């Protein structure tokens, strides 16, 4: 644990909430990790316990003074133990972020409080839309305006932290190129959840393909009829919240390295630039940078957005590097399926490939820089 994080954990409110989250994580999550990793458990009860502890509610009331640091720190507590569950925590926190920022008061009243407390679970279906905005994919959902709402058809290959009684947010495109962001009720008979092929580390995350069979989306389920201004408002939060997945996994990787010191320190010392103190320095710098950015998630300047994208890229690369170093420090022990080092390595790769992935982040930075020099 970094000194800065330990000091926050020991602090006063609102970090009393963080201590409550840590208590839930430490008492309940370790026993679930193996099943989550194998895909035999979707931890719905644990996610609801996180919500009851306040993990999803610190950013539920949108205002100019809102910051995302408590949500990020709560997620990092989860990530110290299980990267898959931290990803689900991000999905849930992001759903709350959407609902907190919509101007659709009926939708907010229907779902926000329940999502913020964990009573209602759900996720985000923005992987395809986020890629489409940067020319990587085409929009997979198509909608047309009808009386009282829209009819949507198409399919999303992966949406996480969902199930038959869950909801999630996503975007469709109309024939005129306009885009609308909305909330999907997975219990709709015209919405079909499809099982995915096995993943490397995320099979317990409630991840499904989602088929829209001319599903009717009423106006009271619309987050924003004009999606792009809304996306610009929530984009920094969407990306910054993912830092929680990175921070906790890095801390745990550092802890693994330190624990190997007694038995393997005499040889591990030759792992140049891959020592615990190297990653402590990286983590502290990254933590400081993310904390500063997370205090102003509604900033829309290009300079701020570039800094957010850069921080997310650095967080993912640091996570993969730290987990890789932890594997090297554990040696053959970490190569056993029973050792957590190999699981943490698999989870770290996910931080590098979840949208926005490392390659997309690099493209985004290149695009921003090209526009700035034009």
Predicted ranges, named:
Residues 14, 21, 243-246, 250, ...:
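Amphipathic alpha-helix face/heptad-repeat signature
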Residues 155-188:
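DPxDG-like acidic metal-binding loop motif
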Residues 30-37, 283-316, 324-336:
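C-terminal helix-coil-helix/basic helical segment that borders enzyme active sites and/or dimer interfaces
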Residues 332-374:
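Glycine-rich phosphate/cofactor-binding loops in nucleotide/flavin-utilizing enzymes
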Residues 65-69, 145, 220-228, 331:
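Acidic-glycine-rich active-site phosphate/pyrophosphate-binding loop
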Residues 198-284:
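Glycine-rich beta->alpha junctions and the first turn(s) of the following alpha-helix
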Residues 1-70:
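A generic N-terminal leader/anchor concept
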Residues 42-52, 56-153:
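Glycine-rich flavin
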